[in-house]
Amino acid sequence: METWRKGSFRNASFFKQLSLGRPRRLRRQSSVLSQASTAGGDHEEYSNREVIRELQGRPDGRRLPLWGDEQPRATLLAPPKPPRLYRESSSCPNILEPPPAYTAAYSATLPSALSLSSALHQHSEKGLVDTPCFQRTPTPDLSDPFLSFKVDLGISLLEEVLQMLREQFPSEPSF
């Protein structure tokens, strides 16, 4: 009905559409493709065979995305799934409680590994019912190699920081 309202009888493409026996969907897509190819220039023009081949699909089942398509491409192949790390949850290693072989192997190289694992075992053996509400954190062991580190910022960086502090707080004479 809309073709009558538009006055398409006078238009030459109306008779072309009647004479070509294409399905409606293919006609719309090929017209969009031909418009885009002529707008792009001579080097991007398609022949009719190439347009029909791309609209119908390739031998491997994939189809090129077309400008006029509203629905997503269901015929494109999905990427393969990544391999699963663990087949079942029982084979997943327990990170909170390391096995005794682990603590024995690393107790010589890391002195804090044994104390950390024993603290984890003691904490996991306690129930949640008998724990007090507020626990004090233990004082850190200063002989622990993980806690005794020094940061060397360098003289120039320290001088820049002091200069910035002097500029921001000119009333403070201590900088």
UniProtKB/Swiss-Prot annotation:
Ranges annotated as biased composition (Basic and acidic residues): 41-63
GO biological process: positive regulation of actin filament polymerization; positive regulation of pseudopodium assembly; regulation of cell shape; Rho protein signal transduction
Transit peptide, residues from-to: 1-11
Keywords associated with the record: Mitochondrion, Transit peptide
GO cellular component: cytoplasm; cytoskeleton; mitochondrion; plasma membrane
Region entry Disordered, spans: 24-92
InterPro entries: Cdc42_Effector_BORG/CEP
Gene Ontology molecular functions: small GTPase binding
Subcellular location: Mitochondrion
Entries under PANTHER family matching the protein: CDC42 EFFECTOR PROTEIN BORG, GENE 14137-RELATED
Protein name: Uncharacterized protein C15orf62, mitochondrial
